[in-house]
Regions:
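Short hydrophobic/glycine-rich mini-motifs in sensory/regulatory modules
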Residues: 144-154
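Amphipathic coiled-coil signal-relay and dimerization helices
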Residues: 43, 85-92, 138-139
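Extracytoplasmic/periplasmic sensor domains and loops in membrane signaling proteins
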Residues: 54-64, 70-73, 91-130, 157, ...
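Hydrophobic beta-strand positions
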Residues: 79, 143-144
């Protein structure tokens, strides 16, 4: 009888820990998604971005975007023109930053939705897991507009390995 009671208590404690771990991991993923969405909005709405993007000015975008990337600790940021061609890109690495890495961004589903001007029930930003040349990455993509005219897109991404590490750390904390 004592061993049954003890086993039930252990089982309930284990279930509680599983629920807590699951909630913590879910919260970690929510924070990553929120940080990405905040980054997309900040970059797309910062003064000078539309002008630098229209001029295809890497230097102009770098002066504006890099401080946002550094201060917000964003892992990956790409700014694309309306055809999906990269105008600016930066990826945080252990050594610093890799710049202007290229990929077929226009073929990626969340980019296609944004550049087509599509909207769903949640708005004009899209999220997708992409098999990028630098590894599986969760991207949030939003439009860059000059008034009502779509002139490009901002992509903010987090490598899947970083997401897994954040979720694991949160669930064991």
């Amino acid at each position: 009888l004592v061993s049954q009671s003890f086993a039930r208590a252990l089982q309930e404690r284990f279930r509680g820990q599983l629920v807590d771990s699951s909630a913590a991991a879910s919260d970690a993923l929510f924070k990553i998604e929120l940080d990405q969405l905040t980054g997309v909005r900040a970059i797309a709405r910062t003064s000078g971005v539309t002008e630098a993007l229209t001029a295809h000015s890497w230097d102009g975008l770098d002066r504006i975007v890099r401080p946002l990337v550094v201060n917000s600790r964003l892992s990956l940021v790409h700014v694309l023109d309306s055809a999906g061609r990269p105008v600016y890109g930066i990826r945080a690495t252990a050594e610093g930053f890799a710049e202007n890495e290229n990929a077929d961004f226009a073929s990626w589903e969340p980019v296609r939705h944004v550049l087509a001007g599509e909207r769903d029930d949640l708005g004009d930003k899209y999220v997708g897991l992409v098999d990028a040349p630098w590894g599986l990455t969760l991207y949030t993509v939003g439009p860059v507009k000059d008034g009502n005219k779509l002139i490009g897109a901002v992509m903010v991404g987090t490598p899947l390995t970083d997401i897994a590490n954040a979720m694991s750390s949160a669930s064991t904390a």
